[in-house]
């Protein structure tokens, strides 16, 4: 089904923020209630990631955005692949950043906010060898460089709803790990570790240090947009499990809690 763009009027999206009670979102000077409702937009029907085709098949992206808007969405979650946005540990890809800027303008014209989820490594074959070889400190520096570049592009646009630092990050237990990416699901690696070795530190210490470094990177260029990190509610699978990234002593610099539930049909 086609959704012609000519029928869409340019819409002025208002800035969003956490409300004064800290239990929801509002937008604009009147603090109108905002309830995010939308789609994950991470791959097409053949499994291609957005960056695989957004340069050559822009009309497809525009049509998809129009369709999502027509279906009642007000927000779209975009998954940015680190390997497409970083050419080297400290060198962002200018072409990818320009295309992200184009996407932000498309979203604004269509009337859709964006959740920009970053640092993705969903296709293992596309993860740069140099990135996989970095030790923890250097890897975090590259991740900070990534977020600085993204924040520079998005800082002045109300289209950005939030920056989601990483999709469902995890840490090792006591045993040292050897792989940054965890298991595969449907040909993709949606989850990655932020360290391979606790090295005598607690999980909370590592999580806090990582969060603070990335939040600081964003805030160097963008003091306004909300920052979060999407996590799995482990307590539903493991009774008694405690939140890590949203523990008070860990996630104090995040703006809101983002928990990923996967309901079945008719269970929303």
Regions found by a protein language model. Give the residues of each.
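Active-site mouth of glycoside hydrolases
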Residues: 13-257, 261-267
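Bacterial N-terminal signal peptides
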Residues: 1-4
């Amino acid at each position: 089904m086609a959704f012609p763009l000519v029928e869409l009027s340019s819409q002025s999206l208002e800035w969003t923020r956490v409300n004064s009670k800290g239990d929801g979102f509002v937008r604009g000077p009147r603090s109108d209630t905002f309830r995010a409702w939308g789609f994950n937009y991470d791959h097409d029907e053949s499994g291609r990631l957005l960056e695989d085709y957004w340069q050559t098949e822009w009309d497809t992206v525009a049509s998809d955005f129009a369709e999502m808007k027509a279906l009642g969405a007000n927000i779209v979650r975009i998954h940015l692949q680190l390997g497409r946005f970083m050419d080297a540990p400290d060198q962002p890809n200018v072409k990818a950043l320009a295309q992200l800027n184009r996407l932000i303008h498309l979203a604004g014209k269509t009337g859709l906010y964006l959740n920009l989820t970053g640092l993705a490594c969903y296709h293992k074959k596309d993860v740069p060898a140099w990135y996989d070889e970095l030790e923890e400190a250097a890897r975090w520096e590259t991740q900070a460089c990534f977020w600085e570049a993204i924040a520079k592009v998005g800082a002045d646009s109300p289209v950005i709803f939030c920056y989601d630092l990483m999709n469902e990050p995890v840490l090792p237990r006591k045993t040292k790990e050897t792989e940054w990416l965890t298991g595969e699901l449907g040909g993709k690696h949606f989850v990655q570790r932020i360290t391979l070795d606790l090295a005598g530190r607690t999980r909370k210490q590592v999580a806090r240090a990582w969060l603070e470094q990335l939040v600081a990177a964003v805030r160097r260029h963008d003091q306004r947009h909300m920052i979060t990190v999407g996590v799995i509610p482990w307590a539903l699978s493991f009774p008694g499990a405690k939140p890590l990234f949203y523990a008070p002593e860990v996630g104090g610099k995040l703006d809101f809690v983002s928990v990923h539930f996967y309901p079945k049909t008719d269970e929303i």
